[in-house]
A protein has these predicted regions:
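Secretory targeting and sorting signals
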Residues: 1-31
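Generic preference for flexible, low-structure residues
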Residues: 24-29, 145, 154-157
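Secreted/periplasmic proteins that engage bacterial cell-wall peptidoglycan
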Residues: 36-154, 171, 178-183
Length: 185
């Protein structure tokens, strides 16, 4: 590759990086610092978007939270909103239907139990979401046969009874629900 072409590519990448940084949400001086294990302790800005619903894709609020999660947990290989239909096996009030939920994976194959490395990465993602639930507007996290919810946060993780197996029991992915209209957040 020619020196001129390499300089052009370097300049193009630098310009794209600056543009992306300019468009990214910035941490405000009021950003929350959470009390959490060292593996999850970060400064997280408060989600700037209002509770909302959409017909396709993520709401702005959910997209922002998923982006913060993926920025802080780069081992996550995919976070899908699903746009699940009411007959997809989810409960009738699933946050997926309104664009306020995501399912995140760490390299493991959906539908199969993750190996120890992927399981560790998923556990770290779940811990991050719970530790930063206030500013991220997280309403619910389901992972590894357990559930954590904002309204019952003082109880910590509880047994999840909404499904079984790798998918239904949320052993192959971390589910995160973001507060929606009516949740009061």
């Amino acid at each position: 590759m020619s020196t001129l072409r390499m300089r052009f590519l370097t300049l193009s990448l630098a310009t794209a990086g600056l543009a992306a940084m300019a468009m990214a949400p910035t941490l405000s001086p009021q950003a929350a610092v959470v009390d959490a294990p060292a593996s999850t302790l970060v400064t997280v800005a408060t989600n700037p978007y209002p509770a909302d619903s959409v017909l396709t894709g993520y709401t702005q609020r959910a997209r922002w939270t998923i982006n913060v999660l993926r920025d802080n947990r780069p081992a996550l290989t995919a976070c899908n909103h699903g746009n699940y239909e009411p007959d997809s096996g989810h409960s009738s009030d699933s946050y997926h239907y309104s664009g306020n939920a995501g399912d995140c994976y760490a390299g493991n194959t959906p539908g199969q139990y993750p190996g120890p490395i992927d399981k560790d990465q998923l556990q770290r993602a779940a811990n991050f979401l719970v530790a930063n639930a206030g500013p991220l507007k997280v309403q619910q996290v389901i992972w590894n046969g357990q559930i954590w919810t904002w309204p019952r946060r003082s109880e910590g993780w509880r047994t999840y009874t909404g499904g079984t197996g790798p998918v239904g029991g949320h052993y192959d992915h971390v589910h995160v629900s973001i507060a929606r209209p009516g949740d009061g957040r």
